[in-house]
Regions:
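C-terminal segment of classical bacterial N-terminal signal peptides
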Residues: 15-19
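Catalytic domains of carbohydrate-active enzymes, especially glycoside hydrolases
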Residues: 31-53, 117-118
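Active-site acidic/histidine proton-transfer and metal-coordination neighborhood
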Residues: 35-38, 73-74, 92-179
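Boundary/entry segment of secreted carbohydrate-active catalytic domains
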Residues: 20-35
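Active-site beta-loop-alpha junctions enriched in small/polar residues
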Residues: 26-30, 51-55, 84-87, 127-129, ...
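Sec-dependent N-terminal signal peptides
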Residues: 5-14
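Hydrophobic faces of well-ordered beta-strands that scaffold small-molecule active sites
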Residues: 23-27, 48-50, 79-84, 122-124, ...
């Protein structure tokens, strides 16, 4: 029997072995009620992705993630992945090294929270946008270095770090750009 996956990302590049996966389309658990999760499970969905919010204190973010996990468990759904927070402020490719390191420290804390949720995969944005052409080469190098650090953190919790292909001016608009 094929397993159906409720998933917010349609295509991922997994940083651990850099292979593409097409996993389907769905909805974020952060916007789903317990009734909607139960209905999804009844319809044959087996897996969900939990979106980890970057808003609030670390304790508040942790509680939201664990609440989503409890709701999924109660509905009979398994957590396949967690989507790490992303924003212009949390960009892992920024040129300012101290800002980039602060972003990596925060995302490392978020990965530890994900460890309590138990996903197989973590989804990461390789940048925000817009990115000027004159900055792109260095920002790609910064993103690749940051991905290496976060991949090791993901491995510590037993998860595979997956890089979401992003359109427009974002880094990683195709997998070759980050290889």
């Amino acid at each position: 029997m094929k397993k159906r996956i409720l998933f917010t990302a349609a295509a991922l590049v997994c940083a651990a072995n850099l292979t593409a996966q097409c996993l389907g389309v769905g909805s974020s658990t952060s916007s789903m009620s317990p009734e909607e999760m139960a209905a999804a499970a009844k319809a044959g969905v087996e897996y969900v992705e939990i979106g980890i919010s970057g808003r609030g204190t670390v304790a508040e973010i942790r509680e939201k993630a664990l609440h989503a996990k409890r709701m999924a468990d109660e509905a009979g759904l398994k957590v396949w992945s967690c989507h790490l927070p992303f924003s212009r402020k949390l960009d892992i490719s920024v040129l300012n090294d101290s800002a980039r390191m602060a972003n990596l420290e925060f995302l490392t804390e978020m990965i530890a929270i994900c460890g309590e949720v138990g996903p197989e995969k973590l989804v990461l944005h390789p940048s925000s946008e817009p990115i000027a052409d004159g900055e792109r080469e260095q920002r790609i190098r910064n993103s690749i270095a940051s991905i290496g650090i976060l991949r090791r953190e993901a491995a510590r919790i037993g998860a595979q770090l997956c890089i979401e292909d992003l359109p427009r001016t974002c880094l990683g608009r195709n997998s070759a750009e980050l290889l």
